[in-house]
């Protein structure tokens, strides 16, 4: 047995036969080596054939050299296909459509003495010949049978009597069925042989199958009907034929004329009752009306010799599944078959082809964070005897991971290698930061042979904290060997990112719900403040500035605490303005007006604004500290109490 992968053989035949020519065809048009079939493991040898339109027999011989020259595959023995002994016919099924049976007729007469006897005898012994007619007996209702009755007086008995005239059925010609449209049926004998091995044979008919149906051709091959059968002639249509069923006929069936049957039915329905009336009136005889009715029945049941089905065979004699068989004059035309031959390691035919064989020699995993992506790689070596065409794909990845499997095919010489890279992404619904590790399976395949190998590659991804956009928090990290605070900000609702890194002398301090965190000197007074701190030049002292609180107050976003801080600071401003502007203003009035040409009021206003501003800043520094705020409020309440106590006059009653 040759080295390499074993193959399955597919023989695809287009049997194109016209008229009844009997020339045999023994060549093929195409031989290709393709992918696996659905029936046997291994590669597929496809043999395609197109007829010269003048054959009803196929006798194809595929030598070892023919197979190798067309495909590069090596065969240990020749393969032959024979298709012969065609038999084609049209099958006409019968159909029960509720048609009335054909029978003989007896005209009967009966004399009774009462209306009750008339009713009883008529409904029991007479038949209906006209579906639309009814027979009425006064005082006893109606019946759907057809009958005539004469009432007369019997002088011998002195009573009125009734004479009844009606029809009864006698001879049974048979049940009538419709004939359906014909189905073409063919029968061919197949024979396949590899070298001197036992031949594989089968009889293929489209009556047993149809498009997409597969039959066994012995143990090691299959024949599939793939096309539509035609002989180049249309089976005769049945436009004036019915089928009559009775055990008296050969095969249980007889072909009759539809028009004769319709004439019989029309005569019975339209004339049977009138014939009874003529007989009862004495205008004709019993034998005459029976001859009229039975003549129509015999004519309807007679064989329709003018029909093309008069020479047909009976395929099924039962009434439920009856069928006629009509042989066709022409041979098959345009049937299409596929033959699949097992040529694997333990198969029927021995065929092999050198191919590439991949082997994964190295892999490279990936580590990345959420919203990012990583790259995994595999390197495959061709350890086969022939050039290979390698492709790779990510077959599957663990939970939360997905891989991009689109890859270009690479041709690899024996002993050569090819590298394949795959982009891997990570998505998780977890809300907390954690690390996920899993694997992706990568498959490398030689496209020519179907040989494939796989390897598992490690992937690791870090799940970031999910957050509310705009929120800030603080964390610690090492910078130059020192632990510092880092202000983290949520900018996109998915992850926290570094917003500001504090120095070693600073700390991330929470200010309020709007400002949130700021880097402040560790030695600065505690408290939030309302904006960026101001550093006093030369001293390095940091002061809380009120501008942030004022901005919030003006925009309507200030809370109760901010309003209280600004109000207390404004009281400090008024106190500073009054004390400094009045007291200190008097001291500098003369000095200022001596050197500066300004009025005393303007000087006092300027000095008061400076003093008030300094008082405002001093109070603001105090009240932005929680303890200072509390002491300020308590001090104001105590001062107010003492002021009221000292200024309120005593009232003596």
Swiss-Prot record:
The keyword Disulfide bond applies. Residues 154-159 are annotated as: Fusion loop. The extracellular N-terminus has 4 domains; the first 3 are structurally similar to fusogens from plants, C.elegans and viruses, while the fourth domain is unique to archaea. Domains I and II are discontinuous. The fusion loop in domain II is stabilized by a Ca(2+) ion so that it protrudes from the molecule. Belongs to the HAP2/GCS1 family. Fusexin 1 subfamily. Residues 24-559 are extracellular. GO terms for biological process: plasma membrane fusion. Keywords: Calcium, Cell membrane, Disulfide bond, Membrane, Metal-binding, Signal, Transmembrane, Transmembrane helix. Residues 581-600, 643-653 are cytoplasmic. Disulfide bonds join 126-166, 397-440, 467-490, 502-519. Homotrimer stabilized by interdomain contacts and numerous Ca(2+) and Na(+) ions. Exhibits fusogenic activity. Mediates cell-cell fusion in mammalian cells (bilateral fusion). One of its GO terms (molecular function) is metal ion binding. This is Fusexin 1. GO terms for cellular component: cell surface; plasma membrane. HAMAP family: Fusexin_1 (MF_00869). It is a multi-pass membrane protein. The chain crosses the membrane at residues 560-580, 601-621, 622-642. Its main location: other. Residues 1-23 form the signal peptide. It is found in: Cell surface; Cell membrane.
């Amino acid at each position: 047995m040759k080295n390499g992968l074993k193959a399955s053989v597919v023989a695809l035949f287009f049997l194109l036969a016209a008229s009844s020519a009997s020339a045999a065809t023994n060549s093929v048009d195409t031989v290709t080596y393709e992918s696996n079939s659905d029936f046997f493991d291994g590669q597929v040898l496809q043999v395609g054939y197109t007829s010269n339109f003048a054959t009803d027999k196929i006798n194809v011989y595929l030598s070892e050299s023919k197979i190798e020259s067309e495909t590069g595959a090596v065969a240990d023995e020749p393969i032959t296909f024979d298709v012969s002994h065609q038999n084609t016919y049209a099958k006409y099924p019968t159909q029960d459509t509720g048609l009335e049976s054909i029978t003989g007729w007896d005209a009967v007469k009966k004399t009774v003495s009462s209306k009750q006897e008339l009713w009883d005898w008529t409904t029991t012994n007479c038949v209906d010949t006209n579906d639309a007619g009814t027979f009425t007996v006064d005082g006893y209702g109606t019946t759907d049978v057809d009958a005539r009755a004469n009432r007369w007086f019997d002088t011998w008995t002195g009573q009125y009597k009734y004479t009844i005239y009606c029809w009864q059925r006698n001879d049974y010609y048979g049940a009538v069925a419709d004939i359906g449209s014909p189905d073409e049926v063919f029968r061919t004998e197949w024979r396949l042989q590899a070298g001197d091995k036992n031949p594989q044979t089968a009889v293929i008919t489209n009556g047993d199958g149809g498009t997409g149906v597969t039959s066994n051709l012995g143990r090691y091959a299959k024949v599939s009907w793939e096309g539509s059968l035609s002989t180049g002639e249309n089976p005769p249509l049945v436009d004036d034929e019915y089928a009559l069923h009775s055990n008296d006929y050969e095969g249980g069936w007889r072909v009759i004329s539809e028009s004769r049957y319709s004439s019989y039915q029309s005569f019975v329905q339209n004339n049977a009752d009138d014939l009874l009336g003529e007989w009862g009136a004495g205008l004709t005889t019993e034998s005459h009306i029976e001859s009229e009715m039975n003549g129509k029945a015999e004519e309807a049941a007679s064989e329709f010799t003018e029909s093309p089905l008069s020479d047909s065979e009976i395929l099924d004699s039962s009434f439920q599944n009856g069928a006629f068989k009509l042989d066709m004059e022409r041979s098959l035309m345009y049937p299409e078959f596929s033959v699949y031959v097992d040529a694997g390691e333990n198969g029927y035919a021995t065929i092999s082809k050198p191919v590439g064989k991949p082997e994964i020699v190295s892999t490279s995993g990936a580590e990345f964070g959420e919203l990012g992506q990583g790259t995994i790689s595999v390197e495959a070596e061709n350890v086969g005897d022939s050039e290979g065409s390698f492709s790779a794909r990510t077959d599957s990845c663990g939970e939360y991971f997905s891989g991009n499997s689109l890859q270009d095919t690479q041709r690899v010489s024996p002993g050569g290698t090819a590298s394949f890279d795959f982009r891997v992404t990570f998505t998780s619904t977890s809300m907390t930061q954690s690390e996920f590790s899993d694997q992706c399976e990568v498959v490398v395949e030689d496209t020519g042979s179907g040989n494939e190998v796989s390897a598992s590659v490690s992937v690791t991804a870090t799940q970031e904290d999910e957050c509310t956009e705009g929120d800030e928090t603080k964390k610690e990290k090492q910078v130059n060997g020192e632990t510092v605070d880092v202000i983290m900000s949520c900018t996109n609702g998915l992850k926290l990112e570094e917003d500001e890194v504090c120095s070693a002398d600073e700390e991330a301090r929470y200010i309020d719900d709007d400002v949130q965190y700021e880097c402040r000197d560790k030695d600065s007074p505690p408290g939030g403040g309302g904006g960026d701190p101001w550093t006093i030049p030369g001293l390095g002292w940091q002061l809380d500035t009120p501008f942030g609180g004022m901005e919030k107050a003006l925009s309507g976003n200030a809370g109760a605490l901010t309003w209280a801080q600004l109000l207390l600071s404004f009281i400090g401003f008024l106190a500073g303005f009054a004390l400094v502007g009045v007291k200190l203003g008097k001291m500098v009035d003369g000095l200022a007006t001596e050197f500066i040409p300004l009025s005393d009021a303007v000087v006092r206003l300027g000095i008061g604004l400076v003093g008030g501003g300094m008082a405002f800043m001093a109070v603001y520094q105090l009240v932005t500290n929680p303890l200072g705020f509390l002491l300020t409020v308590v001090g104001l309440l105590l001062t107010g109490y003492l002021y009221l106590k000292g200024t309120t006059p005593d009232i003596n009653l």
